[in-house]
Amino acid sequence: MKRSKAYRAAAEKVNLDQLYSPEEALALVASGASAKFDETVDVAIRLGVDPKKADQMVRGTVNLPHGTGKTTRVLVFATGEKAEAAREAGADEVGDDDLIAKVQGGYLDFDSVVATPDMMGKVGRLGRVLGPRGLMPNPKTGTVTMDVAKAVSDIKGGKIEFRTDRYANLHFLIGKVSFGSEKLAENYFAALDEILRLKPNAAKGRYLRKITVSSTMGPGVQIDPVAARDAD
């Protein structure tokens, strides 16, 4: 795969054999970005868990102190006063049966979904559409709730979700290159602390196996898992 000149220039600053501290890695990512748009900064973490076992699934949410820098479109399934509260909180789409039909018809212009508990029986029909995209509302992530206004405000304000995939990897964003390395680091540590808090009791050996940060168009920079926090 042929890389761009800007990518190669950024990659030259990174020692692929070196494990960096979080601050060093994020400084390299921020300084190496050269695209004409404000690149997103992503984190990939390989965990020492067995995702095939239910008691080792790592899933959670965290409110990033500096937000994500991304405009998040939130869809809410609710009726009556709850629907009105969601609209006032800034939800992009609010509805019940009509909105379910719209999504079934192929509408997917949203990034997050919230629902009141009484709507989940109907929202369950959308499992084949929302499930594979990681968009199905879930009580564990605060997206099945009676307080839809708070859920919408949290998501709009920088709340992110993460969950292990079948290879025990987590993928999530921590902001934009324009944030600068200091704010990116604060967002990174907020997410990492929550991931460490959620370490399954059944997990064996080292929990944080590999951590890589990168910008949208830049090379991956590896963070030393031991230096990431008290990793073991």
Swiss-Prot record:
Cited Pfam families: Ribosomal_L1
Q: Does the keyword Ribonucleoprotein apply?
A: yes
The record's annotation in Gene3D superfamilies points to: 3.30.190.20, 3.40.50.790
> Per the record, what is one GO cellular component?
large ribosomal subunit
* GO terms of molecular function: rRNA binding; structural constituent of ribosome; tRNA binding
Keyword list, A-Z: Repressor, Ribonucleoprotein, Ribosomal protein, RNA-binding, rRNA-binding, Translation regulation, tRNA-binding
Q: Name one GO biological process term.
A: regulation of translation
The domain of life for this entry's organism is: Bacteria
Q: Could you confirm whether the keyword Repeat appears in this record?
A: no
What this chain does, per the record? Binds directly to 23S rRNA. The L1 stalk is quite mobile in the ribosome, and is involved in E site tRNA release.
NCBIfam families membership: rplA_bact (TIGR01169)
Q: How does it assemble?
A: Part of the 50S ribosomal subunit.
Stated family: Belongs to the universal ribosomal protein uL1 family.
Annotated protein name in UniProt: Large ribosomal subunit protein uL1
State the organism of origin: Cutibacterium acnes (strain DSM 16379 / KPA171202)
**Name of the coding gene:** rplA
